[in-house]
């Protein structure tokens, strides 16, 4: 009987030791897990969806290396950058105009990558050929986010387009598309979009590109934009089109470790090049960063990743 008690106590001791070791290991893992706040737009925005997708990709085995990305919705880019300045955010997605205009005032924030292209859709009710001449449109329907686009166009137009524009909020795009009667409908968006495809099925609506002169005016006056080729057959029967594009920008606070920035870049483009990337990752390309290498304050790790001079 004493031998059995000794054997039982020895087994119990070994079991307790194993439990204590496992608990200690879990505690060490927990202590090593660092949470990074990724600031994006409100729900139902593309930047919010991208942040959610990136956080899920980051949580996959072998990606995060002991860290978590936590998406946080913040109303606009200016507020996101302010929170990063106050160390209440580690990463953020802001739009191209915000990056161009606001980053010089936030030297502690650096660019990791430009993201997917948001093209400027021009849906015309004017007759083909499918190019919107500089002076053709008399009435426009556009989101408030396209104010600078319409203002630059207005300066070249014989009519006051600013006064003849019916404005809507970007999140109201689907409702604004329904039965619009203006000459031209403008909207920023990724591609392909189901609502654009549905509209183009109706006769009398054409996906168009702007006249070269107007495109040049836009790229000169809106330096955060670039001309972008929408591939042929993105929408049925559509030829390749030269559209205006704006790229959202992923930025990071300088206190974030270089190793995380490096893993982030590899995760972004690794998923983009996978066999089944998520929607907003499909049009990511490292090459897009070449368009902005002299214009935006890139993180040193990103500059090496893109092989900037």
Which positions does each model-derived feature cover?
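Pocket-lining segment of extracytoplasmic ligand-binding domains
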Residues: 96-99, 155-249, 255
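Short, glycine-/small- and polar/acidic-enriched structural segments
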Residues: 29-133
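Bacterial N-terminal signal peptides that target proteins for export
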Residues: 2-12
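An extracytoplasmic/periplasmic, membrane-proximal ligand-sensing/linker region
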Residues: 172, 184-185, 189-200, 207, ...
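Boundary at the C-terminal end of the N-terminal hydrophobic targeting segment
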Residues: 25-27
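Hydrophobic residues within well-ordered alpha-helices
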Residues: 84-85, 173-178, 264
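Bacterial N-terminal signal peptides
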Residues: 11-23
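Bilobed "Venus flytrap"/periplasmic-binding protein-like clamshell domains
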Residues: 32-61, 118-179, 292, 296-301, ...
């Amino acid at each position: 009987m004493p031998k059995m008690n000794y054997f039982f106590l020895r087994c119990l001791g070994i079991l307790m030791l194993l439990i204590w070791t496992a608990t200690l290991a879990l505690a060490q893992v927990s202590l090593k897990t660092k949470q990074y706040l990724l600031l994006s737009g409100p729900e139902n925005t593309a930047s919010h969806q991208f942040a959610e997708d990136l956080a899920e990709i980051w949580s996959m085995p072998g990606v995060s290396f002991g860290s978590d990305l936590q998406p946080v919705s913040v109303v606009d880019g200016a507020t996101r950058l302010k929170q990063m300045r106050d160390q209440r955010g580690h990463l953020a997605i802001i739009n191209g105009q915000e990056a161009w205009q606001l980053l010089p005032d936030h030297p502690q924030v650096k660019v990791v990558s430009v993201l997917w292209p948001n093209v400027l859709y021009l849906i015309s009710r004017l007759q083909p050929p499918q190019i919107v001449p500089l002076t053709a449109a008399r009435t426009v329907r556009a989101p408030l986010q396209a104010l600078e686009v319409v203002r630059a166009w207005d300066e070249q137009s014989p009519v006051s387009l600013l006064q003849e524009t019916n404005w809507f909020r970007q999140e109201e795009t689907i409702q604004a598309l329904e039965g619009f009667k203006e000459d031209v409908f403008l909207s920023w968006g990724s591609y392909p979009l189901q609502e654009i495809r549905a509209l183009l099925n109706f006769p009398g609506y054409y996906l168009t590109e702007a006249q070269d002169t107007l495109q040049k005016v836009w790229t000169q006056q809106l330096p955060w934009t670039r001309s972008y080729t929408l591939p042929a057959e993105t929408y049925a029967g559509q030829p390749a089109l030269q559209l205006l594009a704006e790229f959202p920008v992923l930025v990071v606070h300088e206190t974030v470790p270089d190793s995380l920035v490096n893993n982030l870049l590899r995760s972004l483009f690794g998923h983009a090049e996978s066999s089944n990337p998520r929607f907003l990752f499909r049009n990511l390309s490292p090459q897009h960063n070449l368009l902005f290498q002299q214009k935006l304050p890139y993180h040193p790790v990103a500059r090496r990743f893109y092989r900037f001079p």
